[in-house]
Structures are given as C-alpha cells and as structure tokens.
Amino acid sequence: MDPLQTAHAGPRKKRPRQTGASMASTPQDVRFQDLVLFILEKKMGSTRRTFLTELARRKGFRVENEFSDSVTHIVAENNSGSDVLEWLQVQKIKASSQLEVLDVSWLIECMRTGKPVETTGKHQLVARSDCSASPNPGPQKTPPLAVQKISQYACQRRTTLNNCNHVFTDAFEILAENYEFKENEGCAVTFLRAASVLKSLPFTIITMRDTEGIPCLEDKVKCIIEEIIEDGESSEVKAVLNDERYQSFKLFTSVFGVGLKTSEKWFRMGFRTLSKIRSDKSLTFTRMQRAGFHYYEDLVSCVTRAEAEAVSVLVKEAVWAFLPDAFVTMTGGFRRGKKIGHDVDFLITSPGSTEEEEEQLLHKVMNLWEKKGLLLYCDLVESTFEKLKLPSRKVDALDHFQKCFLILKLHHQRVVDSQKSSQQDGKTWKAIRVDLVMCPYERRAFALLGWTGSRQFERDLRRYATHERRMMLDNHGLWDKTKRIFLKAESEEEIFAHLGLDYIEPSERNA
C-alpha cells in the first residue's frame, strides 16, 4: 500500500474549538475605519470563523465579535441571502437598509488584495434595499472564485520569491524531505510538485474552494491543506518534526560530504549527535567529511548576498589571470534573486580558449588559491563530456562538465557591509562552499539554464521537453527526436523558443 495513503487513512481528530475570548480587537490596527464586519458562524463553524476573523484583523479590518448597529458588512458562508435574513429575524435584529450581506468570497478577495473590494455583483447575497424587507428572495449561490488556467509544468508558471502560501509550502517541503530521507522518491516528488505550484499563486489559499482547478494537488496533499486551514498546522508535519530519525538525518546531512547512506549507517549505530560521531575513534571519515566537520560552524551558516558577491570578485580575479576573455556567471539561487544560500555556484566559459586551456584553467586557479592560502578544500572532477552523446533521459541527471567542489577562505574585509559581529574570537575569515563549472562555449546556454535552477523548474522543463515536444534536454544540449538533430542555442531565450515556451526570467524560476 502507498505509504502516503496509509498516513492519511484514518479520520482526522478535530481540535478543541477556540472561544471568542481570543478574538480581541485593537483599534490602532484598524486601517479601514468605514467598514465594520461581522462574520456569521452559522454553517461555518467557530474554528473557521476564528481563523477568518484573525486574518481579517491582521489585514487591518475591524471585525466585531457580536452583531451590533455599527456593523456595515455581514459575511456568511454556505448561506443564501434568505438564510442570513432569517437568522437576523430569529435574533430579533432589525437590519439597516445600508447593511451589506456578502458571501465569504468577498472577504477572501479582500484578503488577497489587502484592501476592500467592490461588494456588488457575485459577492452580494442580498441587495441593500432588501435587507430590511421580509426574507423572501430565493437562494443565490455564489460560484467559486475562478482559478485561471495553471499549468502542471513549473516552466510554464512564473514563480518569484514572493510566496503567498508559506504555511503550506513549508509543510510540504518538510514532508518531502522526510520521504527523501526514506529514499521514497515518488512520495517526495508528490509534495515537491504541490509546493512548487502553490509558490506560483498570486494569492493566499484561505478556503478549500481556492484549490479548485489547481494541478498537482493529490488527495493526500489536499488533506494536509485542509487540516492547516482548519487547525493552523498539520499533525503529520508535527509528527515528522518530532521524529527521532528525521531529526538525526537532518542533523547528519548538514555536514558537508554526508549523504543518506552514511546517515543511515550512523543512525543504526545509535548516534544522535555530531559530538559523539566526532569523538568516536572507530569511525573513519572521507576527506570531504573531515573538511565538513572542521569547518562545520561556517558551512552550516547561510551565505549572504554580500558574501556571494565578494566570492564572485575572488573567482573572476583568479580566472581572468589566466583567461582574460572568460565569462564568469554566478548561478543557482543567487542568480534567481535569493538573498541567502548554502553555497555559491559559478559557470565559467571562454569563447577564445583552446580545449587544452579549458582543461587546465581550474587546475591553475586551484594552484593560485593554494599559494595564497585561500584553498581550504578541493575536489576536482574531470570532464567526461562527449559532444555527440544524447541528452540524459533522467530529469535529475548530473552533467559531465569539468567541475570543482571547494571550500574557500573569504576574509571579512573583502565583504561589503560585513557585520563585525561575525568576526568572533578574533577570526578574520569565513569558510564558504563554492562550486565551479567549466563548460565549452557552444554549450554555455544549456549549462547556464541547468545550473540556474530551481531544481523543480529544471525537472519540469525536462519533463515538458520529453512529453510535450518530443525532445530531450539536459545541461549539455537539446535533441529533437523527430528531426533527429541537436538544436543549437546561443542563449537561454533561444532554448525556450525551441521548446515553444514563453521566456521566463531567472527571478521567476523559484519553483
């Protein structure tokens, strides 16, 4: 049986309802003084009412706990106009003719825009003039808010760093990571795809109706979304975060050079802390792992954009000392606009160099840094690239270009706006992880596209090429299976054009 299905097989336990005591209002937070809202609990439930009330107040709306003469807008869910008017009569409340009786879709749209929207049309359950009349209008169903056509492929969606659905995507990424630790790729991809599509949405999901028409949301994913909407968190995510195996794998894999196999081995041996692993004399470590432990504190801390820019200057100075015409491009998350990362990636290519000069460049750069005392660790992997070899069928395949995985010493004085607080214990430098990739000039567009990411964007780009265009794409090239030829490209824009896709800027590839 599918492990994901078993995880959601039983009915979810409902949490205790929150009382109205938690629904206090602070006048100084009210941005829209002319509007006074009352959210009807009937057919909605107290938990959801509390959630919407708190959300509206955070957005600057005044929401009353009890109905009063000051209320200007009454919001209801799954109620017709006559239902609301009947409720008002039962409560012996005489509604003003100016009272707006609105479907919850109005409030949701207000939350998305961050300000009040037009009340007329689809949101209105009762016309203003009917509010004081007898409740005889027929039921008026409000259709779900239309979700524009969203592609299942990340390469057809524009995903910036402005994520409106962190509460859901963070949960999905934790679950995906847990399945990756268990080497269950299928389940991991399910949650990664769901996280990817929610990151592209220009609005926050507030109700399950908002998920209608959105691709990549399987039933097990929607179950998590529903629980977070109702309870504010996922019990399954909470269980994962408290799971000893997950905590151990998360800790072990934070060490440079430690993968799943080593983590599994250490966990089975009973290790739960890095200090115990470091001090155990029976364990042997690879050269990469020894470097990972030695510089652990620096490597586990995030690399800032200022530090990345300083490393960029360092790399360009070294490369240009040997190949003055070389192009050095920062790739990865920093090219996509991120402010922090775990390492800094660079793509190097030279239009005027010979094959021998390309092969020797990284060796010369390493020797230069070693002489300057900047090279703390180096693992150079020689190129196995073959020009006539077809692109890989695997969506996660690594490329065959020459590359170097490094740890460099970055002096604080080279960093613009360097915080003095980081210079603790008299230490004047920080160890930074750096990846250098050397590629042939004619393949630079494909390599740049692949190394820019994100991981899910690249996966979907390759899936799209295979399933929709009968092509094969990887970091080396693009093969047309119908014409049986390699398609040339001088830029990323040309690759998108070959695939029949609108060009997407790096800052919109944060899938």
UniProtKB/Swiss-Prot annotation:
Keywords: Magnesium, Metal-binding, Nucleotidyltransferase, Nucleus, Phosphoprotein, Terminal addition, Transferase
Binding sites annotated in the UniProt record for a 2'-deoxyribonucleoside 5'-triphosphate: G333, F334, R335, R336, G337, K338, H342, D343, V344, D345, G450, W451
Principal place of residence: nucleus
CDD domains, alphabetized: NT_POLXc
Named cofactor requirement(s): Mg(2+)
The keyword Iron appears for this protein: no
Catalysed reactions listed for this entry: DNA(n) + a 2'-deoxyribonucleoside 5'-triphosphate = DNA(n+1) + diphosphate
Entry-linked SUPFAM superfamilies: BRCT domain (SSF52113), DNA polymerase beta, N-terminal domain-like (SSF47802), Nucleotidyltransferase (SSF81301), PsbU/PolX domain-like (SSF81585)
Signal peptide span: none
Swiss-Prot/TrEMBL GO biological process terms: DNA metabolic process; DNA modification; double-strand break repair via nonhomologous end joining
Region entry Involved in DNA binding, spans: 258-262
EC number: 2.7.7.31
UniProt: Mg(2+) binding residues: D343, D345, D435
Enzyme class: transferase
BRCT domain segment(s): 27-124
Lineage: superkingdom: Eukaryota
Cofactor binding, per record: Can also utilize other divalent cations, such as Mn(2+) and Co(2+) (in vitro).
Assembly with partners or alone: Interacts with PRP19 and DNTTIP1. Forms a ternary complex with DNTTIP2 and core histone. Released from this complex by PCNA. Interacts with TRERF1.
Purpose of the protein: Template-independent DNA polymerase which catalyzes the random addition of deoxynucleoside 5'-triphosphate to the 3'-end of a DNA initiator. One of the in vivo functions of this enzyme is the addition of nucleotides at the junction (N region) of rearranged Ig heavy chain and T-cell receptor gene segments during the maturation of B- and T-cells.
Full protein name: DNA nucleotidylexotransferase
